[in-house]
């Protein structure tokens, strides 16, 4: 049985009534004939950080990539169920054009992956493929996105330099700025600090904490301490199933399911 709550207080208690931005309903996912996700039901609350935790191979990254239809890139993969996005105008992401889905949902990967372009063009890229060419508009969005990613002051005098010339932590913040530039409703983070040093990790965690006031965040993390530090809600997954979902503090201090208690207390994983 999955423990769920419709309201929660989380690691950083919210003062406002919570609204669902997204919701997974009865989701199954297959890699060919292999059933990787089993009857997943999960709410994602607006302007909150929701963490997906669990041991390697539990399905958390598989679930994350269902949101922006990344699995469509490989033949033989198959979805069953629904993933809804939007409060006032809900859309089933599994019935939309994948390109349109990715315009509404940003993603930041484990390893920084700046495009082989300048810092400026990395951020402007998403706008250009939408047909926006006005230089003043591009300049405004690039600066705003870099500021929101806490990178502007470090790169404002070198916007023509390659994105790959930045340090690892700076490259990851550049990727976050690139995701922010298209004004997404949801940003997916797939272990965004796993390839970074401790100082860069703190910087990214602080940035995520600040960004939740602007955008909803769903993050996969192997670090339970990271989930405690930055998330308001946590979902524990095991063998393709959602075992327990609740506000983060409840998951870590008073889990309902024994499997959850064993995992968060380090008995396996």
From Swiss-Prot:
Places the protein is found: Cell inner membrane
Catalyses which reaction(s): phosphate(out) + ATP + H2O = ADP + 2 phosphate(in) + H(+)
PROSITE patterns the UniProt entry points to: ABC_TRANSPORTER_1, ABC_TRANSPORTER_2, PSTB
CDD domains on file: ABC_PstB_phosphate_transporter
Binding residues for ATP: 54-61
Tagged with keyword Cell cycle: no
SMART domains linked to this entry: AAA
Domain ABC transporter: 22-264
One GO MF term attached to the UniProt entry: ATP binding
Cellular compartments per GO CC: plasma membrane
Membrane-topology annotation of the record: Peripheral membrane protein
Keywords annotated in UniProt: ATP-binding, Cell inner membrane, Cell membrane, Membrane, Nucleotide-binding, Phosphate transport, Translocase, Transport
EC number: 7.3.2.1
GO biological process, one term: phosphate ion transmembrane transport
Zinc-finger found in the keyword field: no
Primary location recorded for the protein, binned into one broad class: membrane
Domain of life: Bacteria
InterPro entries: AAA+_ATPase, ABC_transporter-like_ATP-bd, ABC_transporter-like_CS, P-loop_NTPase, PstB-like
PANTHER family, sorted: ABC TRANSPORTER I FAMILY MEMBER 17 (PTHR43423:SF1)
Annotated function: Part of the ABC transporter complex PstSACB involved in phosphate import. Responsible for energy coupling to the transport system.
Family stated for the protein in its record: Belongs to the ABC transporter superfamily. Phosphate importer (TC 3.A.1.7) family.
Assembly notes: The complex is composed of two ATP-binding proteins (PstB), two transmembrane proteins (PstC and PstA) and a solute-binding protein (PstS).
Entry protein name: Phosphate import ATP-binding protein PstB
Organism field: Thermosynechococcus vestitus (strain NIES-2133 / IAM M-273 / BP-1)
Name of the coding gene: pstB
């Amino acid at each position: 049985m999955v423990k769920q709550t419709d309201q929660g207080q989380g690691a950083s208690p919210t003062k406002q009534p919570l609204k669902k931005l997204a919701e997974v309903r009865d989701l199954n996912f297959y890699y060919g004939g292999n059933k990787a996700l089993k009857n997943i039901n999960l709410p994602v609350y607006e302007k909150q950080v929701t963490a997906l935790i669990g041991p390697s191979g539990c399905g958390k990254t598989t679930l994350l990539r269902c949101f922006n239809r990344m699995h469509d890139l490989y033949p033989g993969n198959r979805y069953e169920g629904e993933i809804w996005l939007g409060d006032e105008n809900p859309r089933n992401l599994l019935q939309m054009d994948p390109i349109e889905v990715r315009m509404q949902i940003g993603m930041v990967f484990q390893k920084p992956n700046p495009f082989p372009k300048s810092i400026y063009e990395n951020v402007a890229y998403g706008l250009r493929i939408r047909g926006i060419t006005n230089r003043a508009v591009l300049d405004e969005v690039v600066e705003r996105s870099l500021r929101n990613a806490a990178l502007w002051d470090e790169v404002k005098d070198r916007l023509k330099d390659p994105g790959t010339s930045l340090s690892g932590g700076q490259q990851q913040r550049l990727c976050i700025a690139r995701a922010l530039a298209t004004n997404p409703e949801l940003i997916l983070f797939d272990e965004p600090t796993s390839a970074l040093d401790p100082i860069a990790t703190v910087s990214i965690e602080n940035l995520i904490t600040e960004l939740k006031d602007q955008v909803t965040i769903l993050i996969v993390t192997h670090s339970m301490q990271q989930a405690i530090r930055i998330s308001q809600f946590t979902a524990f997954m095991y063998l393709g199933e959602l075992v327990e979902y609740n506000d983060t503090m409840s998951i870590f201090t008073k889990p309902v399911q024994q499997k959850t208690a064993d995992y968060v207390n380090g008995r396996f994983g």
